[in-house]
């Protein structure tokens, strides 16, 4: 899996915006990626040093549209903590 395929998109919410002050950045990542792969991908793409990676898995939710039942996509979210002195890569 390529590094650019692991990181899907940044997650911009009120909580993630508050965590940016503490050098914590949130991303949606591929569901098959592990913490080591996520760390290597972030360091390679953004040229920063990663201190720690926390990962959360979200199950698919059952949804109904009219008479049809289906599921939302499952997803995996990673909170990446940068080392002190790293460059702020969203600015």
Curated annotation (Swiss-Prot):
Keyword check for Nucleus: no
Domain of life: Bacteria
Name of the encoding gene: rplW
Native source species: Macrococcus caseolyticus (strain JCSC5402)
GO MF annotations, alphabetized: rRNA binding; structural constituent of ribosome
One GO CC term, this protein: ribosome
InterPro entries: Nucleotide-bd_a/b_plait_sf, Ribosomal_uL23-like, Ribosomal_uL23/eL15/eS24_sf
Similarity comment text for this entry: Belongs to the universal ribosomal protein uL23 family.
Signal peptide: none
Keywords: Ribonucleoprotein, Ribosomal protein, RNA-binding, rRNA-binding
Function description: One of the early assembly proteins it binds 23S rRNA. One of the proteins that surrounds the polypeptide exit tunnel on the outside of the ribosome. Forms the main docking site for trigger factor binding to the ribosome.
Subunit structure: Part of the 50S ribosomal subunit. Contacts protein L29, and trigger factor when it is bound to the ribosome.
Keyword Zinc set for record: no
Protein name (Swiss-Prot/TrEMBL): Large ribosomal subunit protein uL23
HAMAP family hit by this protein: Ribosomal_uL23_B
GO biological process: translation
